[in-house]
From Swiss-Prot:
<dbReference type="InterPro" id="IPR001578">
    <property type="entry name" value="Peptidase_C12_UCH"/>
</dbReference>
<feature type="domain" description="UCH catalytic">
    <location>
        <begin position="11"/>
        <end position="239"/>
    </location>
</feature>
<keyword id="KW-0788">Thiol protease</keyword>
<dbReference type="InterPro" id="IPR036959">
    <property type="entry name" value="Peptidase_C12_UCH_sf"/>
</dbReference>
<dbReference type="GO" id="GO:0035517">
    <property type="term" value="C:PR-DUB complex"/>
</dbReference>
<dbReference type="GO" id="GO:0016579">
    <property type="term" value="P:protein deubiquitination"/>
</dbReference>
<feature type="active site" description="Proton donor">
    <location>
        <position position="176"/>
    </location>
</feature>
<keyword id="KW-0378">Hydrolase</keyword>
<feature type="active site" description="Nucleophile">
    <location>
        <position position="97"/>
    </location>
</feature>
<dbReference type="GO" id="GO:0005737">
    <property type="term" value="C:cytoplasm"/>
</dbReference>
<comment type="subunit">
    <text>Catalytic component of the polycomb repressive deubiquitinase (PR-DUB) complex, at least composed of caly/calypso, Asx and sba (MBD5/6 homolog). The PR-DUB complex associates with nucleosomes to mediate deubiquitination of histone H2AK118ub1 substrates; the association requires the positively charged C-terminal tail of caly, probably due to direct binding of DNA. Interacts (via ULD domain) with Asx (via DEUBAD domain); the interaction produces a stable heterodimer with a composite binding site for ubiquitin.</text>
</comment>
<comment type="similarity">
    <text>Belongs to the peptidase C12 family. BAP1 subfamily.</text>
</comment>
<keyword id="KW-0833">Ubl conjugation pathway</keyword>
<protein>
    <recommendedName>
        <fullName>Ubiquitin carboxyl-terminal hydrolase calypso</fullName>
        <ecNumber>3.4.19.12</ecNumber>
    </recommendedName>
</protein>
<feature type="region of interest" description="Positively charged C-terminal tail required for binding nucleosomes">
    <location>
        <begin position="430"/>
        <end position="478"/>
    </location>
</feature>
<dbReference type="GO" id="GO:0000785">
    <property type="term" value="C:chromatin"/>
</dbReference>
<feature type="compositionally biased region" description="Basic residues">
    <location>
        <begin position="464"/>
        <end position="478"/>
    </location>
</feature>
């Protein structure tokens, strides 16, 4: 929308309490790695870290009238230096409580990627008083544009009628957003309509700050006493689930590669070992072959002793025999070593040793990794689809259907069908009231019946009317 810097603080529109809307609003602010989730069960533990909570509650007109009265409360933090060192902004711009609640969480966390706009705002408002921080929020064009881009078209028309501070749904009542964040080991409640931030105290050493928050909210909502007001909404600002799922998927795939390589290496070593065992068996069968070769060569030498040309040959054979015998001796030594190193095999246990696995264990582990990878990929797909649906719902929420409806009704009127449709609609609405029409008709019959009763003195169906007619005939005979 076009930005008028002179009237920037006058045009903020009210927003719905929807986690998808708040998540998209974070993206428009330039924040990365953060999303908003709705909390349905306050007593259920929340998985993973939580940056803060956003609480939507009913703001009654009576409370709104008393908001200017500064209450003396023990949980108020009135130290000016302490208040200015945290990001607490008073809401001076109407209908900006949704953005205030988000900024109260984001700008009080040090491990969030705020982006350029919010980083500049955080540096600019450092050390400011709460009122000036509120004006700084209202006069930031990027925040105003992002805020109003997610408002319904009805909010613009409703803004002219309702000039209250927070969002209104009907006369005398509105809904307001506040934030709960952990700051310096204490649970703080940041409400832009209050003059000071509220410190609910530290949490225990062996508990998380979310446990402290649940206790505070249970007491406020009356859950612990059974007097619960169901007209509230609770959302949590958490890290983007897709980042954790993507990291988990990467680790699973890395482990899958490692296990596959280990399994392949183990199978390769098994194949090498089986080949060596086959060689040992072959050596067992050929243990007597050196003796046979020596006898054959000796006979050959005896046959050729008388021949002078057989000498070199004998020398070559001797060398060959010596070579074979030496090689045979080496092979036998190797065989004895193999026999000593490899005793008769025993049934392999599940775990051969510390940190080692059998092929069966590796196959089972690889199967579990593949199953976990499929589940994690489905979770990532679900998160991406949910983020896509956030955008679809936002388009449906912010689209102005007035032009379409007016054009559609004009076309029906031009074709002469609008009157018939309106008549059918009116007849359909009258059908549930047919019982009252019949009752009114029956009351009319009663009125006519009463007239006859008044004229004749009694009902014509009663025995007295018959006697009256009899008396009349008797009088006529006289």
């Amino acid at each position: 929308m076009p930005v008028d810097i002179n009237r920037l603080t006058d045009g903020w529109l009210e927003l719905e309490s929807d986690p998808g809307l708040f998540t998209l609003l974070l993206e428009d602010f330039g924040v990365k790695g953060v999303q908003v989730e709705e909390i349905y069960d306050l007593q259920k533990n929340i998985e993973g870290p939580v940056y803060g909570f956003i609480f939507l509650f009913r703001w009654i007109e009576e409370r709104r009238a008393r908001r200017k009265i500064v209450e003396t409360t023990e949980i108020y933090v009135k130290d000016e230096e302490a208040v200015n060192n945290i990001f607490f902004a008073q809401q001076v711009v109407p209908n900006s409580c949704a953005t205030h609640a988000l900024l109260s969480v984001l700008l009080n966390c040090s491990d969030i990627d705020l982006g350029n706009t919010l980083s500049r705002l955080k540096v600019h408002t450092k050390g400011m008083c709460p009122e000036n921080k509120g004006w700084a929020i209202g006069n930031t064009p990027e925040l105003a544009c992002a805020h109003n881009s997610h408002a319904m078209p009805q909010a613009r028309r409703r803004m002219d009628r309702n000039s209250g501070v927070s969002t209104g749904r009907f006369t005398g009542e509105a809904f307001h957003f506040v934030s709960f964040v952990p700051i310096n080991g204490h649970l703080f409640e940041l409400d832009g309509l209050k003059p000071f931030p509220m410190d609910h105290g530290p949490w225990g050493e062996k508990e998380a700050w979310t446990d402290k928050f649940r206790r505070v909210m249970s007491d406020r909502l009356g859950i612990s006493t059974g007097e619960q007001d169901i007209r509230f909404n609770l959302m949590a600002v958490v890290p983007d689930r897709r980042i954790a799922i993507t990291h988990k998927l990467k680790m699973l795939r890395t482990n899958q590669t490692i296990v596959s390589a280990a399994l392949e290496k183990l199978l390769k070593s098994k194949r090498t070992e089986s080949r060596s065992l086959e060689t040992v068996d072959k050596i067992k069968k050929e243990e007597e072959s050196p003796v046979k070769l020596s006898s054959e060569y000796s006979q050959l030498l005896e046959m050729n002793e008388k021949d002078d040309s057989s000498v070199p040959m004998s020398k070559e054979l001797e060398s060959l025999v010596s070579l074979n015998s030496s090689s045979d001796s080496v092979e036998i030594i190797g065989e004895t070593e193999i026999k000593k190193e490899n005793p008769p095999p025993s049934p392999p246990p599940s775990f051969i040793g510390a940190g080692t696995f059998s092929p069966k264990d590796l196959l089972s582990l690889l199967k579990n990794l593949e199953s976990e990878i499929n589940i994690t990929e489905q979770h990532l797909c679900d998160e991406n689809e949910k983020r896509a649906m956030f955008k679809v719902d936002d388009c449906r929420r912010t689209h102005n259907y007035d032009e379409f409806i007016c054009t559609f009704l004009s076309m029906l009127a031009h074709q002469g069908e609008l009157g018939d449709l309106v008549s059918q609609h009116l007849i359909t609405n009258r059908k549930p009231n047919m019982g009252s029409v019949q009752n009114s008709g029956s009351r009319g019959v009663v009125r006519n019946y009463n007239k006859k009763t008044t004229t004749n003195g009694s009902s014509p169906k009663t025995p007295s009317s018959k006697r009256r007619r009899g008396r009349t005939k008797y009088r006529k005979r006289k």
